Amino acid sequence: MAYKQKKYRGKDEKEQKKYILLDVGGTEIKGNVSDRNGVRTKIRKFPAQAQKSTEKILDNFAKICRELMREADGSVVGVGMAIPGPFDYENGISRMQGLNKYDAIYGIPLEREIKARVPELGSARFLFLHDIEAFALGESWYGNCRDADKILCVCIGTGAGSAFVENGKTVKTGKGVPENGWIYQQPFG
């Protein structure tokens, strides 16, 4: 990837607004800190603990946020979580059940629970995105596709996901775009 990596140092950089970015998976959670320009710290990996109890999962999210806050060395104004569905992205509430991951946090507002465990994030804004959409937007804004008007991203992991981006925004309907931008149910041939 063509992302810029940088460890934050120096007076001016300390004063920059920082964002904690988390890619929440079923096996591991990847995280780093970024500024508005996409300058970021090295990606760190943490165990997901996705099959544990409610308290252990929430405590794990809090622990990860605290560790990344130390790397931010400045003001954290936002937390972005790329997380698989089903999930209520607008309200930050997991709707996962029967997937052998994150069942214990079904119906729990994550922003409230993480802020209760990490009071230093009290004024930080949380944004939740579907994991494949977050990847696609990152590629569109900062990655190898930043000069493209339209892109299709396909991710294969535990499951398979897809996202369409046009002019820097995700597209879920329209000509050539299947419902929700999901290609997994499209016939081959």
Residues covered by each model-derived region:
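Short, acidic Gly/Pro/Ser/Thr-rich loop/turn segments
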Residues: 29, 86-88, 161
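Residue-level signal for inorganic ion chemistry
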Residues: 31, 81
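A short acidic Gly-Thr/Ser loop motif
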Residues: 22-27, 155-159
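Acidic active-site catalytic centers that drive phospho-/nucleotidyl reactions
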Residues: 23-25, 35, 88, 131
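Short loop/turn motifs that cap or connect beta-strands within the blades
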Residues: 46-48
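Glycine/GP-enriched mid-protein hinge/lid loop-to-helix segment characteristic of carbohydrate kinases
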Residues: 3-16, 32-38, 42-44, 53-55, ...
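Glycine-rich phosphate-binding loop and adjoining helix at the ATP-binding site
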Residues: 50-62, 66, 75-79, 85-150
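Short, hydrophobic/glycine-enriched beta-strand segments
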Residues: 19-23, 80
